């Protein structure tokens, strides 16, 4: 079976919890940049939780059981969808912090959203195509041929 090192994700989970607790103690959470930061923290919490659960299930002795594989796939989606949102969230946060968000044209916003929309389309069609990842009776997790697209879209 595949062995995953999940120390980073476990630390990220606890760090996200601590930061969320600290964040909810703030008085000015209603500001736009704080709301985006809150979304980023929740995104990270979902991502780290799903990645730890997915890795634990893949390493499980019952990983090839069809039910376990289905739940593992669900956790993979719960990891990948928020993971692909990180560049959009970070970019939005930066644009708001520097005051650029008020000057953004609709064309820019469409161009900004296209990479995320493409990746989201691949993820939503993945159960039928296996383009991003898949599992089989012999392997609980296999990267698909378009997995590098997720990394490419993150850099656009």
Description of each model-found segment:
Residues 2-13, 119-156:
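Extracellular-loop-to-transmembrane junctions of the mid-late helices
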Residues 30-31, 105, 144:
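Helix N-cap and loop-to-helix transition residues
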